[in-house]
């Protein structure tokens, strides 16, 4: 526990909160001990030369079956409560020193930045949250296991190993490897890499790992998005000329869009078959 006589606006580290006694006292959070599951303190942004901060310190807490988001009282913002059953998907990104958590619910969406130096605390909180939010589904249990060793990509192999929980076994999967391409201009010639994508089905969720950041490949880092199977409505094929994408329709009108290269379309179709009860359809662009 950090010293109680320190203003938490001065804290610069993120830390896991294992009990209500570890909550920053100046947040004035009153939670029944029996309902508290876990918490995460995220420090505020460092002030600029005028003393302004882009965002205040926050505490994310798992209380019963709710995700609660509390900001420092000086910000004057009310506590937000998101029932886990309303949570559609989670995004967790780590690129160099920039990390962020994004929670997307039926009527709520918010992003929380942090330094990846403290990623271990964030991962620990997410594991607790997933244990309450995700439940195994029988229809996925009988799928053949997906061997991460077949990825032949160290970055994505490590990212998958770090993302999976202790009792979570990857099942059907699709890895879309990066490609090395060359661009030319009048006086220049340079190589660049296309983004890579890994879609994995586990008994508890559909997981999308990518290094696709704002349309380009992030050399140092990955982004994870995942949702429980009950939140997946359908997989929709989108085509426009030679381009193809797998659109994953989620509850509350949310979706993911995964561009698929021609050489990976058959593998993507096999993954789509896991959701055969939700009819996939080809959607021509512009229709």
What do the predicted segments below correspond to?
Residues 1-64, 90, 95-198, 203-204, ...:
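Intrinsic disorder/low-complexity detector
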Residues 65-75:
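N-terminal beta-strand/beta-hairpin edge segment
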Residues 69, 209-211:
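N-terminal glycine/threonine-rich, aromatic-flanked beta-hairpin/loop signature
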Residues 74-78, 113:
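Short coil/turn segments at secondary-structure boundaries
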Residues 83:
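Short acidic-glycine-tyrosine-enriched beta hairpin
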Residues 87:
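Active-site-flanking segments in enzyme catalytic domains
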């Amino acid at each position: 526990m950090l010293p109680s006589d320190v203003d938490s606006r001065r804290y610069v580290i993120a830390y896991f909160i294992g009990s209500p006694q570890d909550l920053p006292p100046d947040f004035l959070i009153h939670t029944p001990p029996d309902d508290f599951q876990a918490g995460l303190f995220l420090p505020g942004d460092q002030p600029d030369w005028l003393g302004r901060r882009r965002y205040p310190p926050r505490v994310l807490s798992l209380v019963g079956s709710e995700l609660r988001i509390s900001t420092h009282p000086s910000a004057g913002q009310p506590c937000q409560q998101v029932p886990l059953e309303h949570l559609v998907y989670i995004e967790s990104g780590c690129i160099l020193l920039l990390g962020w958590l994004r929670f997307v619910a039926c009527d709520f969406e918010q992003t929380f930045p942090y330094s990846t130096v403290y990623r271990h605390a964030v991962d620990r909180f997410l594991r607790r949250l997933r244990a309450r939010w995700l439940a195994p589904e029988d229809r996925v249990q009988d799928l053949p296991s997906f061997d991460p060793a077949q990825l032949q990509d160290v970055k994505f192999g490590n990212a998958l190993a770090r993302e999976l929980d202790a009792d979570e076994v990857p099942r059907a999967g699709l890895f879309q490897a990066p490609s090395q391409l060359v661009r030319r201009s009048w006086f220049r010639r340079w190589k660049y890499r296309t983004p890579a994508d890994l879609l994995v089905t586990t008994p508890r969720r559909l997981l999308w790992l990518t290094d696709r950041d704002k349309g380009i490949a992030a050399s140092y880092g990955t982004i994870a998005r995942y949702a429980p199977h009950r939140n997946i409505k359908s997989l929709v094929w989108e085509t426009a000329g030679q381009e193809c994408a797998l659109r994953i329709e989620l509850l509350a009108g949310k979706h993911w869009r995964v561009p698929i290269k021609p050489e990976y379309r058959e593998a993507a179709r096999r993954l789509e078959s896991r959701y055969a009860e939700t009819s996939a359809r080809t959607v021509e662009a512009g229709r």
